[in-house]
A protein has these predicted regions:
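Long amphipathic alpha-helical repeat/alpha-solenoid cores
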Residues: 1-202
């Protein structure tokens, strides 16, 4: 716990509060290594109210998550403990309006919980941008169900990935076609893309 205290030193939390939250996270099933990473990503979680976090966990279980899934999601996005259930529920409803089923939103958020931290207008802009590239709305929905992390990439990152692939002699039409079936290409380094494409063509 000493390393966590060092990370939190600038926040002025007293040792008793840190220990209470530390013990709470340990009891939930987090390891010390996981808590250190969480403290680095969002140190304020060690100042959150324990009763509020417990309530959040119980409400998320009602939405369809297991405790193990919540632990995994909050390792990626520890600030989820600071989001209200109302905001999470609203995000699920907003994404249903985009074309997902409730079950699909739950499923993709398990892989990319960061979507709960993105404004719905940000998601809409990402969809509109991808439509401008040549994808159909239903293709984008399918791609993001298969590879939800696309939503966490900035538009500039996607633009750069397309430019990098064009340097490999692929046209934009080629790239659109390839990524429809394999959207995880957007998550590869340019060094790995060529090998992946060659493997797909064999």
């Amino acid at each position: 716990m000493e390393e966590i205290k060092k990370i939190l030193n600038h926040l002025g939390y007293d040792d008793e509060k840190i220990k209470k939250n530390y013990d709470f996270f340990i009891a939930l099933g987090y390891t010390q290594e996981e808590m250190i990473k969480m403290a680095k990503r969002n140190p304020k979680i060690f100042g959150y109210n324990i009763e509020n976090m417990q309530y959040k966990i119980e409400e998320m279980k009602k939405l369809g998550y297991t405790q193990e899934e919540i632990i995994t999601m909050t390792q990626i996005l520890p600030q989820m403990y600071g989001y209200s259930i109302e905001n999470i529920t609203q995000k699920i409803e907003d994404m249903q309006e985009l074309g997902y089923t409730r079950e699909e939103v739950i499923k993709l958020s398990k892989i990319a919980p960061q979507i709960y931290g993105l404004a719905i207008n940000t998601l809409k802009r990402k969809i509109e941008y991808m439509e401008s590239l040549g994808y159909l709305r239903e293709e984008i929905i399918k791609m993001t169900k298969d590879f939800p992390k696309i939503y966490t990439y900035g538009i500039e990152n996607i633009q750069q990935k397309i430019k990098d692939m064009q340097k490999l002699s692929y046209t934009q039409e080629d790239i659109i076609k390839l990524t429809k079936g394999n959207p995880n290409i957007y998550g590869y380094s340019i060094e790995n893309i060529q090998q992946k494409i060659e493997d797909m063509q064999e």
